[in-house]
Amino acid sequence: MSDRRPIATLPDLLISQIAAGEVIERPASVLKEILENAIDAGARAIEVRLEGGGIRRIAVTDDGSGIPPEELPLALTRHATSKIRSLDELESVASMGFRGEALASIASVADLTIISRTRGAEHAWQIDGGSLQVSPASGPPGTTIDVRQLFDRVPARRKFLRSEATEFGHCVDAMERIALAHPEVAFRLFHHDRAQRQWLPADHGQRIRDVLGAEFVGHVLPVLAAAGAIALMGMVTRPTAARARADRQYLYVNGRFVRDRTVSHALRSAYADVLHGDRQPAYVLYLDIDPGAVDVNVHPAKHEVRFRDSGAVHRFVSQVVGQTLAQTGGAEAVPAGVPDGAAPDTAYAGEPAAAAPGLAEPRAPYPAAYPSPGQSPYQGSPARPHTQVPFRLHGEPAGIPATDWQSLYRPLPGDAAPAATALRAAPATPLPTADEHPLGQALAQLHGIYILAQNSRGLVLVDMHAAHERVVYEQLKRALDDRALPRQDLLVPVVFHAAEKDVALVEEHETQLNELGFEMRPSGPASIAVRSVPALLARGDIESLARAVLRDLGAVGVSRLLTEQRNELLSTMACHGSVRANRRLTLEEMNALLRQMEITERADQCNHGRPTWVQWSVNDLDKLFLRGQ
C-alpha cells in the first residue's frame, strides 16, 4: 500500500487548467467564450481571424466598450467578472457570461494577449496572460483577444483535437450560432487571412437567410406567439423539408444557444403527426422568458438550462408549433428554392413562398415585421373556405370502359348535332380563383390512385388515399376529444376468426372499445363479432380495422393506448377506413375530398408524413413542352 499523500491546496494554474477541461474542449469553445464576451461588451462589429483551424491562433477584435487598464489583470483572474454581484443577480442573469472563468481558463492552456481601449482613452493597453504585465499599445476603441498555440501546455488535451479542417468547421458552427442570436451585430471571419464569412447587420429573418441559405428559408414557416411572460418566434421547416440528421436545430433561450430536452420533446410532439419515419425537423427558434424563470447556471459551458415550470414551457412550445404546422395548406403552397426573379417551379404540398417571410419578435429589440396572430404569414395568401363539404363514397360511376375507347370517336347521331354545336359555342368554365378553391376543381382520376385537378396556378395532383387518410384522422381526433365519436351499427355483424388472446382482450376491455366507437363481442371461443364501428370508418374493411385495433391494444395496453398512444391508434384506424387505391370516384366525390383537404389541419401530409399533393404551375408545364423557349 502506497504512502498516504497529505491534503493540499491546488495551485491556481492547475485549478484554471481543471476548469478549462470543463469549458474549453476545442478551438470552437475558445471562440464561443470570446464572442460572448464581445457581445456582453456591446460590440456591433466583430472580426475573427483563425490559423490552423483555430489551433494555432484565434484572434477576435470587437468595437465594444473596452476594458480599463486597471481592470485588465482582473480580467485574467478566476471568478472576477463585471456581470453579477449577488445571488439575486445570478438568478436573473441576462448576460452571456457571468462566472468569470473563461479568460483565466484559456490563459492556462494557451498563450493569450489582450489589447483593449475604452472610448475616450488616448491609447490602448495590452496585457500578456503569462506575465500579467500591463503596457501601452496601439489600437482602436474596443478589445482584441489573441489566443495562440492552444493546448501546447497540455499535450494530453491537444492529441484529442481533430484535423485543422474539422476544427475550422466547428469554429464556423460556433460563430453561426452566435450570429443567429445577434443579427444586429456584423461579423467577419478570416482563415489564414482569407475571408470565409461576412454577415452584415440585419433583422432576424435576413440573418437566418444569410447564415443558413435561401434554400433553408425557402422551406420554413414563421412562428410568432406570446402568452404572459413567455414568447416564441423564429422559423420551423415544413414537414416535407425534414432532414435525415438533426444538424439544423437552433434553439435560443433569452438569446443564448442551448440544447434543452424539454423544448426538443415539445417540438417532436408538434411534428409527431407529420414527420415521415426518422426524419428530423429543422428550426431556428427564439424563446423569450423571464430570466428569473430559467436557470442558466446548470452546465459548465452553459449549453443547458433548467426551467422553473418546464411543463408550461413544453405545452406552450408544443401548441404554438403544432398550430403553425396545422395552418399550412394548399392555399399557401408555392414553389420553394426558386432563385429571386426566376419563374416558379413545381411546388410540393406545403412548400412556402419564394420570398422568405419576414420575421418579427414579440418585444424590443425585436423588429415588427411579423404577421399578427391569426393572420396568414404569407402576403397574398388566399383565405381558406370555412364551409365543410361532406365526403361520402357512392356507388361506382357509370363511366366508359377503357376497352371501349373507340366509341369516343364514332360519328354523333343526327339529333345530337345541335347539342354539340351549343356545347362548342358555350364559353369555357372559368378557372376557380384562389379565394374560392385553392386546390381547384377535379378533372379526372388517374390509375385509381391520383386525382387530377385544375386550380388558378395550374395542375394539382392528389394522392387520394393519403389525403383521405389525413382527413379521416383529423375528424377522429376531434370527435374523440369532444367525446362525440358517432357509431354506426352494422346491419349484419362481421364475424372473423381470432386468437384466444384477442377474444380475451375484447371481453376485458369492452368499455374502452366502446369509447372508441366499437362494439365487439366474442361469438365463440375463437371468433369475434363486430356489431358497431365508428361511423367515419363504416365503409372501410371492418375485419382489418378490428384486427389492427386489437393488435395495438395487445401491444401497448389499454391505458397507454388511450393516452400517449391514442393518436397512433387513430392513425391506424384512419388508414384502414380511408378510400383505397383503385376505387373509382365521381367528380363530385373528388371535389368533396379537395374541399375537405382545404379545411383540414395538416392536410399537406398523410398520417405517416408523406405529402398528399403536388402542384405544377402553368409555367412548369410550358417548360415540359419547350413552350416559349
Swiss-Prot record:
The keyword Glycoprotein does not apply. Belongs to the DNA mismatch repair MutL/HexB family. One of its GO terms (biological process) is mismatch repair. This protein is involved in the repair of mismatches in DNA. It is required for dam-dependent methyl-directed DNA mismatch repair. May act as a 'molecular matchmaker', a protein that promotes the formation of a stable complex between two or more DNA-binding proteins in an ATP-dependent manner without itself being part of a final effector complex. It comes from the Bacteria. The lineage of its organism: Bacteria, Pseudomonadati, Pseudomonadota, Betaproteobacteria, Burkholderiales. CDD domains: HATPase_MutL-MLH-PMS-like, MutL_Trans_MutL. Keywords: DNA damage, DNA repair. The keyword DNA repair applies. GO terms for molecular function: ATP binding; ATP hydrolysis activity; ATP-dependent DNA damage sensor activity; mismatched DNA binding. GO terms for cellular component: mismatch repair complex. Residues 371-382 have a biased composition (Low complexity). This is DNA mismatch repair protein MutL.
